[in-house]
Amino acid sequence: MFKTALVTGGNGNLGRLVAQNLEAMGTRVVSFDLPGSEGPHCDPRHAVVLGDMRDQSLLEDTLATHKPDVVIHLASMLSGSSEANPELAWDVNASSSIRLMRHCLDRNIGPFFFASTAATYGPDLASPVALTR
C-alpha cells in the first residue's frame, strides 16, 4: 500500500473516514485542513497541517516535509458557501486543486485522487446515490 498519504480536507466528514481507513491499512496520514477544523474528532495519530489550500508555499512545504507518495484531495468549499462567493469558490475548488496537482507532478508524487461532490448531479438526488448513476 502507501507509506504516507496527504489527505486534504482530512478533518472533514469524508476526510476523517478516508484517513481512518488508510491508518488501518498501515499508511501514515497527514491531514491538511483549515484552522478551526481540528478538535476531539481528529485522530491524534495523524500529522495535521492547518492552512488554506490557496497558501501555495504552505502546500509546497507540506509536500517537501512529509513526502507523501499518494494525495487524496478532498478539500473544497461546500455548495452553500460556494454559491454565496463564487469567485472564492473558484479559487479554492478549481485553481487551488490544479496548483496542487502541478506541485505533485513536479515532485513525482502519485497517485492523486480527487473526489467531487454529489451536488455535481443536481439538487434532487435520492440518498444514497447508486454508483451506476
For the regions a language model picked out, list residue spans one by one.
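N-terminal Rossmann NAD(P)H-binding glycine-rich loop of SDR-like oxidoreductase domains
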Residues: 5-25
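SDR active-site strand-loop-helix element
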Residues: 8, 32, 71-75, 112-118
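Conserved glycine-rich Rossmann-like NAD(P)H-binding loop of the short-chain dehydrogenase/reductase
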Residues: 27-38
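Rossmann-fold cofactor-recognition segment
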Residues: 43-55
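A hydrophobic alpha-helix adjacent to the NAD(P)-binding/active-site core of NAD(P)-dependent oxidoreductases
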Residues: 48, 89-90, 104, 112
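NAD(P)H-binding glycine-rich loop region in Rossmannoid oxidoreductase-like domains
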Residues: 53-92, 123
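Conserved cofactor-binding/catalytic machinery of classical short-chain dehydrogenase/reductase
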Residues: 55, 70, 96-99, 111
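Conserved Rossmann-fold NAD(P)-dependent oxidoreductase catalytic core, especially the SDR/UDP-sugar
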Residues: 98-133
